[in-house]
Amino acid sequence: MGRMHSRGKGISSSALPYKRTPPSWLKTAASDVEEMIMKAAKKGQMPSQIGVVLRDQHGIPLVKSVTGSKILRILKAHGLAPEIPEDLYFLIKKAVAIRKHLERNRKDKDSKFRLILVESRIHRLARYYKRTKKLPPTWKYESTTASTLVA
């Protein structure tokens, strides 16, 4: 699938290894990995940030190959999953930052236009998450209350 508001097709990506078993050099147990995930989630880190920390600092290439389940599933099982999905959260955060910028710079027409694009992405993503039941059907994005969602 291509980009929404530009011409890019977005076809480059990293190739996942075919072998689904953990690497032979990895000596970390699944319970230790889950414990690290819980500790990072309690500090307030998002699932993607947890994955980056595990990869870069602890040498765990794929959590799923070690534990058998993904980071978000582990967090959901322990009740630590974020209430708003991560990609939607960061789009809302971006919209709040643009609105704050527009309060100071009222004549910035390009930012007004970009805010419209970001908010249309938010609405489209929210519609998808309501359909897949990751968000409650009554959830609605409102620009006035958005800053409390990301605070």
From Swiss-Prot:
GO terms for cellular component: cytosolic small ribosomal subunit; nucleolus. Pfam families: Ribosomal_S13_N, Ribosomal_S15. GO terms for biological process: translation. InterPro entries: Ribosomal_uS15, Ribosomal_uS15_arc_euk, Ribosomal_uS15_N, uS15_NS1_RNA-bd_sf. The keyword Ribonucleoprotein applies. One of its GO terms (molecular function) is small ribosomal subunit rRNA binding. It comes from the Eukaryota. Keywords: Ribonucleoprotein, Ribosomal protein. Belongs to the universal ribosomal protein uS15 family. This is Small ribosomal subunit protein uS15y. It comes from Oryza sativa subsp. japonica.
